[in-house]
Curated annotation (Swiss-Prot):
It catalyses: [protein]-peptidylproline (omega=180) = [protein]-peptidylproline (omega=0). GO terms for molecular function: peptidyl-prolyl cis-trans isomerase activity. The gene is tig. InterPro entries: PPIase_dom_sf, Trig_fac, Trigger_fac_C, Trigger_fac_C_sf, Trigger_fac_ribosome-bd_bac, Trigger_fac_ribosome-bd_sf, Trigger_fact/SurA_dom_sf. This is Trigger factor. Keywords: Cell cycle, Cell division, Chaperone, Cytoplasm, Isomerase, Rotamase. It is found in: Cytoplasm. Consists of 3 domains; the N-terminus binds the ribosome, the middle domain has PPIase activity, while the C-terminus has intrinsic chaperone activity on its own. Belongs to the FKBP-type PPIase family. Tig subfamily.
Length: 442
């Protein structure tokens, strides 16, 4: 196979490939023979039609299909030979065969390379590892907080304050024209403690029942509701009800008998274990985010536009599917946020981890994968069903393999960098704004 590589200023990378005419003609002939065996043409017995007749009848369509397959075959052989990793879908261009004497056909392919990346000064990176101390008093408070309590919401004739429960009706307008399909009634939420857009929370404060509030927001280009994308939308909100919370201990929690004390003693260790597990997950993620962020700061990592756009589309599909499955509200905050920062985080993590795997020639340890499967399956009612599913499902096997490789790569990174320990008490951990840390990760 002959090929010529070049780099275009605007169009990415290009390779010109030559396919011998004998290869094309042989492939065409084999296809004509297949058609002759399976197709009956008037005037000829099945399997006896002359190749010339089949060529006249089907030649153009078959030639295009054969050449398309050969172009893809030779291009991917070129990628394998040159050990090139591409992103996105390559674009194929057939050259005009002006010189009939040539012994080959020419075509070009434009493609985008997966980013080349070398990690430097890894030993100079410093990050913080948070160790959270949980005292007996912390666990007792947690048990007390989660005891059976009955929340009573009492209607009040007062201005809305934070942590009140508010019920609203709303409708929306674009350029003073109402979009009726998005009308919603009796939407209840706790002010300053919800997943809705911030504008709603601060606009509603200090208002009363029957007050009507207007505010305008620009919907994001990737909002799941296509009809609202990139549009300036005005919300008209009417407050229907304002309620304040009153906590009452249930009758069960008032009966401090011996059985309950035994239950609390049993729950103590379970709650302690659960708290440690949840804290470890959050602090490990915090540590890993710092590592990726520091590597990006010290090393130039350019994300190819094709790769970025591809990941944007994938994330948008996920968000849209989730939005539809959960029958979400258009006021949900996460659907009004830019996808760019989340996509950057994902791609930085993916590229860095893949580079670590490549540099260190890591391979998935089957014993560790089996341990992971057993751990995951233990969370289900029928663990054996999950294990059977894993053994049958190739996609699930690949997912588990990637998780194991990521674990090994991250472990290597943690061993290579400088980690400074920070000791926190449980209260500091609870009060830390973890969401803001995630938002700053770019």
């Amino acid at each position: 196979m002959n090929f010529f590589m070049e780099k275009n200023k605007d169009a990415g990378h290009r390779v010109t490939i030559k396919i011998p005419k004998t290869t094309v003609n042989n492939s065409l002939f084999q296809e004509f023979i297949k058609i002759r065996k399976t197709t009956k043409i008037n005037g000829f017995r099945k399997g006896k039609t002359p190749i010339r007749v089949i060529q006249e009848k089907y030649g153009s369509a078959i030639y295009y299909d054969i050449f398309k397959k050969l172009m893809q075959k030779f291009f991917y052989e070129f990628l394998k030979t040159e050990k090139i990793k591409i992103i996105g879908s390559p674009k194929f261009y057939i050259h005009q065969d002006e010189d009939k004497k040539k012994e080959y056909f020419e075509y070009s392919v434009i493609y985008e390379l997966y980013p080349q990346f070398q990690i430097k000064d890894i030993k100079q990176i410093k990050v913080n590892k948070i160790n959270v101390e949980i005292t007996e008093e912390d666990i007792k408070k947690n048990i007390e907080t989660n005891k059976n309590k009955k929340n009573i919401w009492n209607p009040v004739n007062k201005a809305v304050k934070s942590y009140d429960r508010v019920t609203i009706n709303y409708c929306i307008y674009e350029k003073n024209k109402k979009i009726k399909k998005f009308d919603k009634d009796n939407i209840s939420f706790i002010v300053s403690k919800n997943t809705l857009i911030p504008q709603l929370n601060y606009k509603i404060i200090n208002h009363f029942v029957n007050d009507i509030i207007f505010f305008k927001i620009k919907f994001h280009a990737f909002h799941p509701e296509k009809e609202l994308q990139n549009k300036d939308i005005t919300f008209k909100i009417k407050i229907i009800k304002i309620e304040k919370k009153q906590e009452l201990e249930s009758e069960k929690s008032n009966k401090k008998n011996i059985t309950e004390k035994k239950t609390i003693q049993t729950d103590y260790q379970t709650i302690k274990n659960n708290l440690h597990s949840q804290i470890n997950i959050i602090t490990d993620k915090y540590l890993e985010n710092q590592i990726i962020q520091k590597i990006v700061e010290k090393n130039i990592l350019l994300l190819p536009p094709l790769l970025f756009q591809k990941e944007i589309k994938n994330l948008y599909k996920q968000y849209t599917k989730q939005y539809q499955e959960e029958n979400s509200n258009i006021l949900e905050k996460k659907y009004h946020m830019s996808l760019d920062s989340e996509v950057k985080k994902r791609l930085y993590f993916q590229i860095i981890i893949e580079q670590i795997i490549l540099n260190n020639k890591l391979f998935a340890d089957e014993n560790n994968i089996q341990k992971l499967i057993k751990k995951i399956s233990s969370n289900y009612k029928n663990p054996m069903e999950i294990i059977k599913l894993y053994n049958k499902n190739k996609n699930l096997k690949n997912t588990m393999k990637n998780i194991e490789l990521e674990r090994q790569a991250m472990l290597l990174l943690k061993k290579s960098i400088k980690i400074e320990k920070q000791n926190w008490n449980f209260e500091r951990f609870l009060n830390y704004n973890w969401a803001s840390h995630e938002e700053l990760m770019v």
